[in-house]
UniProtKB/Swiss-Prot annotation:
Its main location: cytoplasm. The keyword Cytoplasm applies. NCBIfam families: chap_CCT_delta, thermosome_alpha, thermosome_beta. Keywords: ATP-binding, Chaperone, Cytoplasm, Nucleotide-binding. PANTHER family: CHAPERONIN. This is T-complex protein 1 subunit delta. One of its GO terms (molecular function) is unfolded protein binding. It is found in: Cytoplasm. SUPFAM superfamilies: GroEL apical domain-like (SSF52029), GroEL equatorial domain-like (SSF48592), GroEL-intermediate domain like (SSF54849). Heterooligomeric complex of about 850 to 900 kDa that forms two stacked rings, 12 to 16 nm in diameter. Molecular chaperone; assists the folding of proteins upon ATP hydrolysis. Known to play a role, in vitro, in the folding of actin and tubulin. InterPro entries: Chap_CCT_delta, Chaperone_TCP-1, Chaperonin_TCP-1_CS, Cpn60/GroEL/TCP-1, GroEL-like_apical_dom_sf, GROEL-like_equatorial_sf, TCP-1-like_intermed_sf, TCP-1_chaperonin. One of its GO terms (cellular component) is cytosol.
Length: 536
């Protein structure tokens, strides 16, 4: 035993040669995270820009989606690696912050990670890289703000140009001349003059109806429901001078709160039960009719039918139009539009809680029907957009594209500055940051230079997706910007470099600043991860 213990004891306990941490494992995990995130970025890169490709997504339940919206593609993608999931969340963050630039933000993040990978390989510490990226990002925002052109809400043309730029990269780009002005008018109609910088897109309701083409899309000054009027008992389908109630209770016999059974011993008792039910329903309808109400919007009930056949019969006799199964999440929009209050109990049914409209009618549209409420008195600041499409795929993509256009206009309302598109701001950023990197000392300069080079991925990808020579295009862009042409960008339609502002290719400043800020934050977070711990 002593012979065995002797060599063990002779080993130094705190050998300087031994490493305290397993650096190899940390590097492997960091590079695995970077490679996974870059794979996600490469998957959506081909869909960037007006000439970008579309993706066909087939879901597990057999649904097929055709889109080139970055947020939609990534949202439907099954990503398992945790770092790659961060890029999916990054796209969602950009979607909620700006509504557009969801592909751009992921592509920039992928390019930054590629540059960081080479910096790490050269032995630069992740913390140094992270701090330098933060500094470069701040400088980039300052440069973009200096390049921006102020815009006023009265300048409708600038708003339309910006919305058109967003729509030009979509599947429905040929309809941008229709959808862009429609998006601008919809947003401007819901702006509160007292708080002009706040736009709530929940005040704009998009209703999809299959049939026709996207050309038939239009705004409705009032309310539109993709529902039919209940006509089981021959009730009215058109009401003028409507007094509308939005109710959240059922017009049906009451039920007990506890589980119990009632034993009926003879037919007279049965007859009495039916008579009581009839009297109860008649009493409710008399109260409703007494207020002058002639249109009922009934909230959908998950427990039972919101309205029974007997109730429909009596409502039809009272000449009251019934629209049932209104979704719970629509109630707030409906009451705001009609300038009325939702009624939760028959005892609270009052005339002052009703909304007033000139006309409520059921209209035929294609092979289906919709309900329109127009001429609303004291209408709230809301608007409805009726989107049409020849098939479900086009209809869904038209809705997504219109949502992006609405978000772009919202961005301009909240931060009223425009910048050029077509890769012009990214090349200008790359040039100015590259010059700034030369005056920085130490490793910071290398990191900022890498940040500047990463931004060139946007013009490079735009040119590549348009079938142009990306190296020649980016080189020519650099020369133009070096000569002071800060608005020189890629005109993918002409296949050459032009003054992109003159071509009306513009985007909100908020979209670009948000993309660069969020991409930088995400990359810094990925760089700081040196281990993945799985827990049960």
């Amino acid at each position: 035993m002593a012979a065995v213990a002797a060599p063990m004891a002779s080993k130094p306990r705190g050998s300087k040669a031994e490493s305290f941490v397993d650096n190899k494992r940390r590097e492997d995990i960091r590079f695995a995270n970077i490679n996974s995130a870059r794979a996600v970025s490469d998957a959506v890169r081909t869909s960037l820009g007006p000439k970008g490709m579309d993706k066909m997504i087939s879901t597990a339940n057999g649904e097929v989606i055709i889109t080139n919206d970055g947020a939609t593609i990534l949202n439907k993608m099954e990503v398992l690696q945790p770092a790659a999931k961060m890029l999916v969340e990054l796209s969602k963050s950009q979607d909620s912050a700006a509504g557009d630039g969801t592909t751009t933000v992921v592509v920039i993040a992928g390019a930054l990670l590629k540059e960081c990978q080479s910096l790490l390989t050269n032995g630069i510490h992740p913390t140094v890289i992270s701090d330098s990226l933060h500094k470069a990002c701040g400088k980039a925002i300052d440069i973009l703000t200096a390049m921006a052109v102020p815009v006023e809400l009265t300048d409708r043309d600038s708003l339309v140009k910006s919305a058109s730029t967003s729509l030009n990269s979509k599947v429905v780009s040929q309809y941008s001349t229709l959808l862009a002005p429609l998006a601008v008018d919809a947003v401007l109609s819901v702006i509160d003059p007292e708080k002009p910088e706040i736009v709530d897109l929940r005040d704009i309701k998009i209703v999809k109806k299959l049939g026709g083409t996207v050309d038939d899309t239009h705004t409705v000054k009032g309310l539109v429901f993709d529902k039919k009027v209940s006509r089981a008992a021959g009730g009215p389908t058109r009401v003028e001078n409507a007094k509308i109630a939005v109710i959240q209770f059922q017009i049906s016999p009451p039920k007990t709160d506890i589980e119990q059974s009632i034993v009926v011993s003879d037919y007279t008792q049965m007859d009495r039960i039916l008579k009581e039910e009839r009297n109860y329903i008649l009493g409710m309808i008399k109260k409703i009719k007494a207020t002058g109400c002639n249109v009922l919007l009934i909230q959908k009930s998950i427990l039972r039918d919101a309205v029974t056949d007997l109730s429909l019969h009596y409502l039809a006799k009272a000449k009251i139009m019934v629209i049932k199964d209104v979704e719970r999440d629509e109630i707030e929009f409906v009451t705001k539009t009609l300038n009325c209050l939702p009624i939760a109990n028959i005892e609270h049914f009052r005339a002052e809680k009703l909304g007033h409209a000139d006309l409520v009618e059921e209209a035929s549209l294609g092979d289906g029907k919709i309900l329109k409420i127009t001429g609303i008195k004291d209408m709230g600041r809301t608007t409805s957009v009726l989107v049409r499409g020849s098939n479900q795929l086009v209809l869904d993509e038209a809705e997504r594209s219109l949502h992006d256009a609405l978000c772009v206009v919202r961005c301009l309302v909240s931060k009223r500055f425009l910048i050029a598109g077509g890769g012009a701001p990214e090349i200008e950023l790359s040039r100015q940051l590259g010059a700034w990197a030369k005056v920085l000392h130490g490793m910071e300069g290398y990191c900022v230079k890498s940040f500047a080079e990463a931004l060139e991925v946007i013009p490079y990808t735009l040119a590549e997706n348009a079938g142009l020579n990306p190296i020649a295009i980016v080189t020519e862009l650099r020369n133009k910007h070096a000569q002071g042409e800060i608005n020189a960008g890629i005109n993918v339609r002409k296949g050459q470099i032009t003054n992109i502002l003159e071509e009306n290719v513009v985007q909100p400043l908020l979209v670009s600043t948000s993309a660069i800020t969020l991409a930088t934050e995400c990359v810094r977070m990925i760089l700081k991860i040196d281990d993945i711990v799985t827990v049960r």
